[in-house]
Amino acid sequence: MIGLDRRVFLRWLGAASASAATPLLAQQAPLDPERSAAQLIKPQTQAAIDRGLTWLAGRQNEDGSFGGTGYSRNVAVVSLAGMAFLSGGHTPGRGEYGRQVNRCVSYLLAAEDDSGFICEPEYTSHGPMYDHGFATLVLAEIYGMSPDSDIREKLARAVRVIVTTQNPEGGWRYQPKVSEADISVTICQVMALRAARNAGLYVPNETIDRCVDYVKRSQNADGGFMYMLTGGPSRFPRSAAGVVALYSAGIYEGEEIRRGIDYLEQHRPAAEEFSRDTHAMYGHYYAVQAMWQAGGEHWQKWYPAVHDILLKTQQEDGSWMDLICPEYGTAMATIILQMPNNYLPIFQR
């Protein structure tokens, strides 16, 4: 059950963000979201989404955090859960899961420290900049829909953290400081900056230009992406992230995009990867965004394939298993399945 009627939601979102949204570069015409959603989100698809969101909502604690596993109270998991609810049209205080979205926002705002860094040190992994990037992204999406002075103030500080910790190569690494860089952490920050700029916050052009240069230099000859500029083989998850980083920076066509899309189509993981690869859901989260942006036959062939895998791997209780935690897996899966909704600005062309 979606939160709001599609046309009502898109009109409301457009009215809320039209005056603030500033794209990084001129964009191509989008796919028709009405047609795509009607064709691809069938009743059984919506039923799977509903079961997933219901399970996810049931795992949320009163303070907005999620779960009781090793990633309980993790900021990135809270942020992705918020994105999952938003992707179904559930917005702060509106829709079936509006209350859950409000809790996510409250938890993330409370997790920001005096410097603007969003992280719960006791409940993070080895890479807290993942937490910060995902949190900044979802807060920017929410602020663009429903401007709030408290969110804007904290969001602006979070953006400054990203801008000031970019390293000389143009990327970011695990910690909120200038050091090394890798493509995986970098994509989180690029999407966060794109969302923030769309919502009307200042992001220096120089920051974007430097990260575009970093991502382009990370591409291997086969079209995939290396982990760090020191070299290394291409892998599907980080290659999907690399393509989306370019799209998020406003690069919608060109040789890098073409070769990246070709690589992804040639290296799509088999269905069994979902149960044994820590990065499988992560890779498909970015790959579905890349194919949505690529459009045409790329999208029309990609979504049904990953859709079928997700429906087959959903658990009886509505969740999706992942080696990180089921809350993470379920949030990722429901975001992927709801991509045709085209609700969120960060996923729009």
What are these regions (language model features)?
Residues 1-17:
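N-terminal secretory signal peptides and thylakoid transit peptides that target proteins
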Residues 10, 27-51, 65-100, 113-160, ...:
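An alpha-helical repeat/solenoid feature that recognizes helix-turn-helix modules
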Residues 63, 317:
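Acidic carboxylate motifs that coordinate Ca2+ or other divalent cations, activating on Asp/Glu
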Residues 98, 105-107:
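Active-site-surrounding "flap" and adjacent substrate/cofactor-binding loops of secreted or lumenal enzymes
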Residues 300-316:
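Short glycine/proline-rich, acidic loop/turn segments that cap or connect secondary-structure elements
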